[in-house]
From Swiss-Prot:
Main location group: membrane
UniProt keyword annotation of Cell membrane present: yes
Protein purpose: F(1)F(0) ATP synthase produces ATP from ADP in the presence of a proton or sodium gradient. F-type ATPases consist of two structural domains, F(1) containing the extramembraneous catalytic core and F(0) containing the membrane proton channel, linked together by a central stalk and a peripheral stalk. During catalysis, ATP synthesis in the catalytic domain of F(1) is coupled via a rotary mechanism of the central stalk subunits to proton translocation. This protein is part of the stalk that links CF(0) to CF(1). It either transmits conformational changes from CF(0) to CF(1) or is implicated in proton conduction.
Record InterPro entries: ATP_synth_OSCP/delta_N_sf (IPR026015), ATPase_OSCP/dsu (IPR000711)
Protein name as annotated: ATP synthase subunit delta
Topology of this chain in the membrane: Peripheral membrane protein
Similarity section: Belongs to the ATPase delta chain family.
Subcellular location: Cell inner membrane
Protein's organism: Xanthomonas euvesicatoria pv. vesicatoria (strain 85-10) (Xanthomonas campestris pv. vesicatoria)
GO CC terms: plasma membrane; proton-transporting ATP synthase complex
Domain of life (superkingdom): Bacteria
Amino acid sequence: MSQALTLARPYGRAAFAIAREGGNFAPWSDALAFSAQVAGDPRVAALLLNPALGQEQAVTLLAPPQAGEDYLRFLGVLADAQRLSLLPEVAGLYEQLRAEAEHVVKATVTSAAAMSQTELDTIAAALKKRFGRDVDITTAVDASLIGGAVIDTGDVVIDGSLKGKLARLQSSLAH
C-alpha cells in the first residue's frame, strides 16, 4: 500500500497542479472519483492488465462522459506509464491537496446511532476552533461503538466512543 502511495504521489500532485492552473477543482474531483471507482472494480482492474486492451480504450473506459481534454491527456499519461491501477490512490492524494488549498479539514464522524444536525454542527464548530479551518463532515454509523463517537480527520483521531473508553479501561486494569 505504501508503495502504491509513493508511486501515485507525483500523479496526484500533477493532477492538482493542472486543476489549480485551470481553476477547476470540483470537475477534477468528480472525474478522479469516477475513474478511481471504475479502476477499483476488480473486473476492470483485471481488464486493465490485459495487453490486448489499447491505451485509448483504457482511457475511454475510465474517463467520465464530461471529461475535458486536460483530464483525458492526464489519463493518457497514466496509461503510458501503466499506472491506471493507481487511480484510487491518485484521487485520494488529490483530495488531500485540494482540502489543504481550500483550507478545509475533512472529518469522518462515526457514531453508534445517527446524529442530529445540531450535534453535527456542535462537532463542526469545535473542530473549526481546534484546527482553524472550515470542516467538511462525513457521517457513518457503527453500532459496535455502543455509544459516543469517533472523529477521524486523517491526521488526528478523537475516540470518544464507549467502546474505546472500555478498551482503555481494560488496558489500564491489565497493567
